[in-house]
Amino acid sequence: MPDEVVTRFAPSPTGFLHIGGARTALFNWLFARHAGGRMLLRIEDTDRERSTDAAIAAILDGLSWLGLHWDGDVIYQFQRVARHRDVALSLLEAGQAYYCYATPQELEEMREQARKEGRPPRYDGRWRDRAENDAPSGVKPVIRLKAPRDGETTLDDKVQGKVTWANKDLDDLVLLRSDGTPTYMLAVVVDDHDMGVTQIIRGDDHLTNAARQMQIYQALGWSVPIMAHIPLIHGADGAKLSKRHGALGVDAYRGMGYLPEALRNYLVRLGWSQGDKEFFSTEEMIEAFDLAHVGRSPARFDFAKLENMNGHYLRHADDRHLVDMLSTTLPFLPKGLELAPKFTDERKAQLLAAMPGLKERAKTLVELLDGANFLFAERPLELDAKAQALLDASSRAHIAALVPLFEAAPEWKASALEAIVRAYVAETGVKLGQVAQPLRAALTGRATSPGIFDVLEVLGRDEGLARLRDQAG
């Protein structure tokens, strides 16, 4: 193995950082960190028509949010076009490539003939050994690799095992287009070589590219990096991942209230396993990750499992960390921008105090924020249908009777307030629920909330009593 492990994540900025790309980045990052190496980031932006600055920003932001920090500066493939062109010309000079003057019409005829014969379309090599003085006038040539025609190309893939292609089935691929721009196949090989990449970890939809890229490496006399083609992600039903399954941008998961550490943990378990262990800290992932435990079968994305895992992380998270996460994630959450002005230091302190009860009932930050809605609500509270039903005349009478008892409370603590209510229940003979539920409705506007005495304490004496007086009969 080389002295230093160097991996790379190389997305195309033609859209968001989707969940499959995020997992590929995670695997590259973990592999590099495990070996004490580096993960580089290359933006493959040679498709100028489809590449956008917004997509680049989304990729960088998504990786940063997930905590997958790359090493060194971002490398932009388009800025290296001159280098790619020089390499193509060097292959030409070495007799490893040639000018091809086949016209679009000729190429279409080759494709049509292949269709008729029921075989994959491939270039027939007609310009492979022809002299340049045969070139038709007015036709700009492409440069094609002079690929081996006999024998086999074999890849010892670290996930897929040994994969072999017959060279007769691999045609002479284009390296440089007629306008002088490099093809993806050439650019990837040159960039990986120049960046010192030692391990290529990518989706198995790139497996067919591997044979062609290996032939370019061999023509250049360069060593081929170790390759690992990881299985794609499918939906829970086994079908190819689509938006309904979860093929969304990483930013969408942030907006749905998932914690980055929970999403990292869920993604690492999609295709990689370490016994029956489900939950991994980042340090444990780095320590345990290897390619030997990556399976070959497509992993299945299951929203329910992700949600349950996120709930686990919420319940076990430090309360202050969750307040900070809510604060920074607020602009991305539904109605978060509306709440932002209310997210004062006083509200944050209340949120911190309420967090033990809130996080037990939530699986996402969206649910956590929804549960904390009572802290941001303004008087008079808007009551939902269930809360209105709870606040009948009898319930309002109980609230009216409790207000002076609460006013006389020597301290505004949950335990003291609970003692007052229990004494009232014992004296009047009503059931605790007949009092606690109307209190909840009056204080939160809902029929569900954290423990009602905790709610009273968190709201504080003045706000708590004011809300009760609003609903007292």
Curated annotation (Swiss-Prot):
GO biological process, one term: glutamyl-tRNA aminoacylation
UniProt keyword annotation of Ligase present: yes
Pfam families: Anticodon_2, tRNA-synt_1c
Enzyme Commission designation: 6.1.1.17
Placement of sequence motif 'HIGH' region: 11-21
PANTHER family xref list: GLUTAMATE--TRNA LIGASE, GLUTAMATE--TRNA LIGASE, MITOCHONDRIAL-RELATED
Family from the record: Belongs to the class-I aminoacyl-tRNA synthetase family. Glutamate--tRNA ligase type 1 subfamily.
Protein task: Catalyzes the attachment of glutamate to tRNA(Glu) in a two-step reaction: glutamate is first activated by ATP to form Glu-AMP and then transferred to the acceptor end of tRNA(Glu).
Protein's name according to its UniProt entry: Glutamate--tRNA ligase 1
Organism, as annotated: Beijerinckia indica subsp. indica (strain ATCC 9039 / DSM 1715 / NCIMB 8712)
